[in-house]
Amino acid sequence: MSRERFSGNLRNRLHSDEWLIWQDQYEAKENLKYESLFALSNGYLGIRGSHEEGTKITLPYLYINGVFDKSETFMRELSTLPNWLGIRLYVEKELIGIEDCEILEFSRVLDMKGAFLGKRVRVKDSKGRETLIEGIRFVSRNNVHRMGIRLYVTPLNYSGIIEVESIIDGTIINFYDAPRFKVKHTYMTANEKLAADGCYVEVATRENHLHVGCGCRIEAYADGKQILGNRMISRFGEQSVEFGDIHVEEGKEVEIVKYVSMYTERECPAYALHTTIEKEIEGFVETGFDQELKAHEDVYKKMWENADIQITGDDELNRAVRFNIFHLMSTGNEHDDHVNVGAKLLTGEEYGGHAFWDTELFMLPFFSWVFPKTAQNLENYRYHLLDAARANAHKNGYKGAQYPWESADDGTEQCPDWTIEP
């Protein structure tokens, strides 16, 4: 089976092949495709499948469902928010990354049944040092305000010190690769320590001034003991960085764990965002990465019991159907009836994150049959925006209600009357 390429850390957690989507070769030109395919969502937020160390071609976007902004653009868009993925490892100031070293092994895998992203990378740096990194990433469906990354790092032919950077990046902008449409929808209101350890960044949307907080804390372990030394917090403009170092021995594995939490003032007052996130991360660390991941997998196990479709005789087709179900049910929100399911779900910024008539025509039947509470929320979303639909009808000379072709958070028409194409 394909999972046999991994060590026991991931092999024992991965499901059988018909649940797995693989990337077995790194090609920079394919980055944006795999960032979309490997996006993870939990109904509350979604983050693209970018690499932790960063790459030249990337759109490392994170969205919280329903957080829109217009600013100087011609329509309200899902706002790109501070990205917490960043983890960079250095040996003697040399970055251990897939675009900075020779790649000896490379595999990434989306486990749809467990709803997590795994990876295995073995690289050789300019001085011949080989490092094996395996990792697992998830955004919890058990507690939608918890996200985590665990890296298993093994220096294969050297001993020494590995320096670690954990980053929250608040510089991300919408349509970074489209000069005509570039825009930054947020401004920073805080860049500070989370507590004694950890980083905290807070931003607000430019138009409605909705505050969003993001906090993270990194730890390192060997044989169950914390080993991260020389910890410090630095701020570089709109980036917040937690630094530490690890003494490593040849052939001995260490674990690096990043605990993350995000809230908006839709869930708690703006003045309480920092303390709420601080307490959430304290609870996450106390609960433990494994226990939260297990609770997350248990939620998806129940979801798949309702949603799975089994096709015998064609594993590839079965995998494709499950892939569609996975992303669809990962985006639907059973707890919030003020958000919808956009045409690109929470995997990218095309269509501005807007909901079309596709929701009712193609998605609602699925949710009605499999997840009726989510279906009810999708209908309530339209009900909450009925007054805007009436205003839209009146604007266009009609009686009654006319729902917009493209809908964001306020029910006004977001489809432009005209647009410019190259």
Can you annotate each of these PLM segments?
Residues S2-L40, Y44-Y351:
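Acidic/polar, glycine-enriched structural segments that form the non-catalytic walls/loops
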Residues G332-T347, V370-P422:
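Helix-terminus loop motifs that line ligand-binding clefts
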